[in-house]
Curated annotation (Swiss-Prot):
Protein name according to UniProt: Probable caffeine synthase 5
Gene encoding the protein: TCS5
Organism of origin: Camellia sinensis
Metabolic or biological pathway, per its Swiss-Prot or TrEMBL entry: Alkaloid biosynthesis
Keyword Cell cycle among record annotations: no
GO biological process, one term: methylation
GO molecular function terms attached to this record: metal ion binding; methyltransferase activity
A UniProt-annotated Pfam family: Methyltransf_7
Residues bound to Mg(2+): 173, 259, 261-262
Chain sites annotated for binding S-adenosyl-L-homocysteine: 18, 61, 66, 98-99, 134-135
């Protein structure tokens, strides 16, 4: 099965769903709202007299309440600018994008209960539609978007990195599912190469879709360290690999399935992201910063409660692609193992996560 068919967050609204276990990305989105507000204000300052409608896309929207916050923030800022500039009523067209496997039903069910859609009596009329497809390619007509937003999505790769088997067909990243301290250099290079290729495709597609002077607000999980095997970027996948390895030892998973599985994700450094944007040359970097955050689970004093909540959050975004490789029937055992490993080996300590915030403007010309 291709990545685009297996990569999505846990569906529905149950106890293991992404909708119920996305508090960390909600925290990140909340902290970066001032950046989005400033981006909307900047759009009006550039060419507000030309605006009749603002076309916006949220790429990789999943089913998180983040999407509702993004729409409400943009709508509120548009209403504010309309009052300040005494301009005509504007329309807000929002496209919600994710891969076809995303639970758009749950997304729109929540959206209709939280965001006023299509109300002509408001200063800004809001219209929303879903756009399934991969953001690594074109999704919209040329020069049709003024604002692109994406939170914790652009780090996902279009496929597992190429070149992770030897000439003899042997796995080069044995007993691991991502970069680790024991991974050979070729694994690190393969992951960076795949991210470079995919993020370049992402930028190229958006450069055709975004109008001149339009902008993008991108938030990615990343790392402060230059070392891609640092714990801040490898924590989740490293411990899941250990948990899967224990299930292999118990005969519940075939070892070959572990050795041949590599997660299609990459946590870049700020320097790597900056280098790719500058090499592409379609956008200027208006703002770029990295910041660290504790996970919300760290607020829990009891380490078992803390880690059990962490395991649910991890399960919400990893289970679909993990179960596609290893089978649905062992998922409960796997995440129980994950919980036990974090508590027993790390005493419930969870490293901080680095987020990269990037504001890009489309170059005129």
């Amino acid at each position: 099965m291709e990545v685009k068919e297996a990569l999505f967050m846990n569906r529905g609204e149950g106890e293991n769903s992404y909708a119920q276990n996305s508090s960390f990305t909600q925290k990140v989105a909340s902290m970066t709202m001032p950046v989005l507000e400033n981006a909307v204000e900047t759009l009006f300052s550039k060419d507000f007299h030309l605006l009749q409608a603002l076309n916006v896309v949220d790429l990789g929207c999943a089913t998180s309440p983040n999407t509702f916050t993004v729409i409400s923030t943009i709508k509120r800022m548009m209403e504010k600018k309309c009052r300040e500039l005494n301009c005509q009523t504007l329309e807000l067209q929002v496209y919600l994008n994710d891969l076809p496997g995303n639970d758009f039903n749950t997304l729109f069910k929540g959206l209709l209960s939280k965001v006023v859609v299509g109300n002509k009596c408001e200063e800004v009329s809001c219209y929303v539609m879903g756009v399934p497809g991969s953001f690594h390619g074109r999704l919209f007509p040329r020069n049709s978007l003024r604002l692109v937003h994406s939170c914790y999505s652009a780090h996902w790769l279009s496929q597992a990195p190429k070149g992770l088997t030897s000439r003899e067909g042997l796995a080069l990243n044995r007993r691991k599912i991502y970069i680790s301290k024991t991974s050979p250099l070729v694994v690190r290079e393969a992951y960076l190469s795949q991210f470079h290729e995919d993020f370049t495709m992402f930028l190229n597609a958006r450069s055709q879709e975004v109008v001149p002077n339009g902008c993008m607000v991108l938030i990615l999980p990343g790392r402060q360290s230059s070392n891609p095997s640092s714990m801040e970027s490898c924590f989740t996948w490293e411990l899941l690999a250990i948990a899967i390895g224990e299930l292999v030892s118990q005969g519940l998973i075939d070892e070959d399935k572990l050795d041949t599985f590599n997660v299609p994700s990459y946590f870049p450094s700020l320097e790597e992201v900056k280098d790719i944007v500058e090499r592409d040359g379609s956008f200027t970097i208006d703002h770029m910063v990295g910041f660290e955050l504790d996970t919300p689970q760290m607020q829990e004093n009891d380490k078992w409660v803390r880690v059990e909540k962490l395991a649910k959050a991890v399960r919400a975004f990893t289970e679909p692609i993990i179960s596609n490789q290893f089978g649905h029937e062992i998922m409960d055992k796997l995440y129980d193992k994950f919980t036990y490993i974090v508590v027993s080996d790390l005493e419930g300590k969870i490293p901080k996560t680095t987020s990269i915030v990037l504001v890009l403007s489309k170059i005129i010309g």
